[in-house]
């Protein structure tokens, strides 16, 4: 499920085609995941072409929460590490909304203690939590320009 972060252009192209075939099946099977432990969804992802190369969280806004705290309520799984996504100007993302509300700083603190296995630690933490929603997107990263370049 977790992959090496280095790939050739040909490997990335092959993976992209497999992802384009796999990800729409998540939409078709969504009802099989919602209300079930996240382990069922992660088992499907583990057996697919989608390799987790980065994880982010779905979190509440500090503006909406008491004392500016933020809470984790889901995960964003990325098929590329940040540097590669920025270079390629695209990334596939699976978003999983969970029936949970973890305080963000404690969540990330616990993950950081796992060292290089931090992504695996995050997934393990979520396995028994019920899935409320799952979606995906092929996100294109826009070209960044400064005001002096315009």
Feature names for model-found ranges:
Residues 1-10:
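Bacterial Sec-dependent N-terminal signal peptides
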Residues 33-150:
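A cross-family detector of function-defining hotspots
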Residues 13-36, 44:
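Terminal, regulation- and interaction-focused segments at domain boundaries
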